[in-house]
Amino acid sequence: MGAEYEPQTFGQPVERNENPSIRTRDPEKYFRPSRLPIKNTHLNNFEFFNPYYEQNYNEIKLPATLTRTPDGTVLNYFSVLREAENLTQNQLGGCGTVGMAKLPYPIAYNFFTEDYQRRVAYDEYLQSFAGIGHINVIKLNRLPDEKGFTPYFIELETIEGLSKGVTYFAYYYGYIQLKKVHNLYKIDHMKLYGEDFLCAAYHLWQHDAEAVVATMYGNWCNLIKKQLPTKQDGYVKTIDFIGTDGADYRFIFYELTNNTDVLIS
């Protein structure tokens, strides 16, 4: 999808005194898909695509309105790609033309900075969508600015094809980095992780926010004097504790569609 890709990692078994009492209380939740509303709905008029028929990616000039704000850049990028399709002979789906077919890809490629385009050639970019017939943005959060860059956390829901002719939902989370170029915000890097729905229900504890804090900062570091109740607002989990060193600590996690938790700050 134009990003570096890695499977979701949950950590490896450790030799420290892992607490066997830390168990998933509701394993069924790890198998359930998302019901969140989608966010990439900025382009509901398909006439937007009319000027770009028969144009190569290097002939396209995006309207400046699409990249004037950081939020706008991310949501417009994925709005362009929402109904893009790159199904293959080995990854089939649908019953005829799907969405806007491959028309959106050269348009979306122009949301990248020139430097990112040098790092990710167009053919490689197109191949990163192989098997995908639909993309929804279901979570989007701006993170604290870094020097020269504006980062975002994102979670995507895709519909993908299989060789046996069925389609399935897949979920990815990751990070997008924007760079301001001539007063416009362009995508300078993306990295996505595929979500696994069969690991957390059976193995490890690194996917559970409360277990991460209790194990790493309590059992291992003896840093927790008093851990306060977890606060949850939607998919954002906040865990506070008072340290044995007298300091106050706060950890923020995002809960993914597969109900695993990712440490954000």
Can you say where each PLM-predicted feature lies in the sequence?
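A short, amphipathic edge element
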Residues: 126-149
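Short, low-complexity N-terminal intrinsically disordered segments enriched in polar/charged residues
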Residues: 2-98, 102, 201-206
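Short, charged low-complexity intrinsically disordered segments located at boundaries
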Residues: 105-112, 138-143, 156-160, 207-208
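Exposed beta-sheet edge and beta->alpha loop/turn motif
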Residues: 1-44, 145-265
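Core segments of small alpha/beta cavity-forming domains
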Residues: 52-131, 212-265
